[in-house]
């Protein structure tokens, strides 16, 4: 039985130059593991709370309080416990914090410990993390949802939609899907250059040109796909993360593309997009608390496209359960730092899958070289992963880990492909 012997933590930098928490654990059998915690640019109101210092250092974004929480409170509480009892460890962390939103110790402190313990336990057992968490049947490689054009909170442009993604659903393997997506990414750069548009990068490695709006961005990407010789729709489909909470207010509704719109008008806009483009997924099309709008939208177009709840659900089993009961959305975005422990993350995924909801594993805009989510995507069989463009090493690290996993699985590996999107029809309605 592997026993926790040492727990340490430090302040490191994420991909946006902001401090974050890194945790290291050592077991009595000599096993050592570390985990680093990501953070988001557009965060949901209902997410677990990151503990920041709020002082002069790093503009108030330092995390020494969270680091000290690990060293002074968490470490003494879990040293001597068995590392292979993840649920027990995570429950001990929740009990120690004692708040519903993890605001006392900080979700960044708690998650770092939770993930580091899991990685150490896997290594102690002689198993890859995906195998340790997913068991002997974990073998599905996810479709990479590659954010190749950035807007919203991820870029300093006038484009309201936060992410424009390509999904290489027609590829025969993850390795080929990565190649296809990467070739489209480079093709898009050429298309942008030819049109005199910026090829500067946003937070997640995608290009951040200042284009006229959603349709203009989708047209650029469609052109880039076709320029590679791949088929738009059959080979490479499109997806959006609207992040609608970012442009919603109770007073004005949705301030989108220089117009004030209602939830119904936003729904009509999405229906038009579905008629015109091969969209497989739309994330956060409405605000995080617009439950009635979500239900109406799901009823209207949920049989045609994946509707993903990110800010709506914040990887929280309780909010997900409410959404399932109401009939809001049909997929869950999974971000481990939104909820703050591995156990709660796995519980949310289990609830989603048992209720017929799809899941998409996701990074954050402030990332590190940690590759846990790549293993987690395979472990839970999500069939989809969102971890940015094929650029910037903190994004590529996850893709490279998935290449290793596919190679490890050998003939047992299966690429999710278009089966990850059962609601999608290759040909647009009109």
From Swiss-Prot:
Gene Ontology terms: biological process: glycolytic process
Subcellular location: Cytoplasm; Secreted; Cell surface
Catalytic activity: (2R)-2-phosphoglycerate = phosphoenolpyruvate + H2O
This enzyme's EC code(s): 4.2.1.11
Pfam families, per the entry: Enolase_C, Enolase_N
Protein keywords: Cytoplasm, Glycolysis, Lyase, Magnesium, Metal-binding, Secreted
InterPro entries in UniProt: Enolase, Enolase-like_C_sf, Enolase-like_N, Enolase_C, Enolase_CS, Enolase_N
Protein name: Enolase
Lineage per the UniProt record: Bacteria, Bacillati, Actinomycetota, Actinomycetes, Mycobacteriales
Gene designation: eno
